[in-house]
């Protein structure tokens, strides 16, 4: 039941009574445990969740590919993640299903605790290597007794040398070595947002949550007694208000991942010749993660124009006036004054003449001097 209390470190709707908080706090004191040690005692290990792994077509020991890491959602088993305290494996993958990563996930504990979802399964986060796993990642759900195929479409954004030579104020982005963070060693935009949340936690509650503990600072790690403060200040912590927001410039060079998922029910009675599927069970979750193509798109950010280019363009325009004589200047003035005015006057006279020639006939009553009564006869009078 202790897992329900950890939602107080992440959500704003997890409120507990003082008696419940003191009960959990007494567990730490009686066992002489810190919050980080307490969480480590409750978590699963990767070998308990990863039943079988295959990479580049070879079945491998999952511990060679995955390491236990900290995320915004707690502890996770991470592949190719660069994080403090982990050995970065720098695994490379080619396109196609055979060159991707295949996993058989098995949840061995049948005594499910109270969940915040009506589904049982695993959460899959796909993101940049240097980013701290959080809600900024592309999140997918892997249900039990299913086989899922996750295809990745990669887009890389990089800058030319001309852009790199510009100051930050002109390119409106930063490179990873140009912006330092207090709680993270590598700068990417998601890390900056989370760094801002951690700073707000320390400012408002005097501590930060256990998953931000990387031994980079001496700030206190929040305990169960700090949950009411975290919940009450949740809008300010997650920067919903402008006064608690931080300056987080975009990164000039980054990778973006578009993930497309396909899910199918797991058929245990289907005969297969692939040894990867040997011994699968009813509640297993199988997932295949691979690049959809051998090539990927690279977007280059380049400099369209700078001061040198602008001056050269203006110089080309000014070169039209090189060798201009006084007579040419007089001709230009004469054209824009006398010639244009004379053409305008001639156009007005021509329009008046056309209106005169096409004027409508006039209708009038004839005058009769010998009769006092007005006659009901009219005539048409025209001009030659």
UniProtKB/Swiss-Prot annotation:
The terms under GO molecular function for this entry are:
ligand-gated sodium channel activity
Where in the sequence does glycosylation occur per the annotation? 32, 215
Where is the protein situated, by its record's location annotation? Answer: Membrane
Q: Give membrane topology per the record.
A: Multi-pass membrane protein
InterPro entries, from UniProt? Answer: ENaC, ENaC_CS
PANTHER family, per the entry: AMILORIDE-SENSITIVE SODIUM CHANNEL-RELATED (PTHR11690), PICKPOCKET 16-RELATED (PTHR11690:SF237)
Describe its function: Part of a complex that plays a role in tracheal liquid clearance. Probable role in sodium transport.
Q: Which family does it belong to?
A: Belongs to the amiloride-sensitive sodium channel (TC 1.A.6) family.
Q: What is the protein name given in its UniProt record?
A: Sodium channel protein Nach
Q: What is the lineage of its organism?
A: Eukaryota, Metazoa, Ecdysozoa, Arthropoda, Hexapoda
**Gene from which this protein is expressed:** Nach
